[in-house]
Amino acid sequence: TSESTAAADQNSAAAESSSESAGGEGAKKVLRFGQANAGDGLDMQTSTSSRAASIADEVTESLLRFDDDNNEEPVLITDFPTVSDDGLTYSFELKQGVHFTNGTELTSKDVKFTFERMFTPATAAKSTAYFNMIKGAQDMLAGSATELAGFEIVDDYHFNITLEYPFAPFVKNIGTSYADIFPEDACTEAGENWGLGT
């Protein structure tokens, strides 16, 4: 009947509206996360807030992460890095086909950018102590170098990080929020607003 058809049309329209508001096709891509005090932004290079980290961990990734048993597992890399016999050089292979939310594919240049940004004096990163054993980090922090001497890009998916001295916790440290990887283009474009904007 025409009444049952009209009711079906109303139900269909309500379902479509509900689908859009619940994240269906055509919905805005917004993450809402309740937090009493989120700290001073989501850029974990410039923040030490555990509250900010709890949010940042929902939208950014480091090369490794800790599982529920506090064991590390690869996230953005295919496996744990191989380490040279002298304990100085770590060789990484990125997973292929990983994309940032802006659609760009993760490559070695984004990882290099992230670590170099950390040691750039203008960033005023609070997390450098976790990584300042990387060769050339101290020179960048002092402003006498603009590139990280210990970071070598092999190709889009392979890179090496060389340390000044053996440092056993290095692999653990790259699994923290302080080593979340940023897309170079988007981060550069956002400038000082990185981690603050909507």
Named regions from a protein language model:
Residues 34-85:
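N-terminal lobe/hinge region of extracytoplasmic solute-binding protein
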Residues 163-198:
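Gly/Pro-rich hinge or "lid" segments in bacterial periplasmic/extracellular proteins
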Residues 79-130, 160:
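Aromatic- and charge-enriched surface segment that lines or borders ligand/interaction sites
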Residues 54, 58, 62, 71, ...:
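Extracytoplasmic/secreted proteins, especially bacterial periplasmic and envelope-associated proteins
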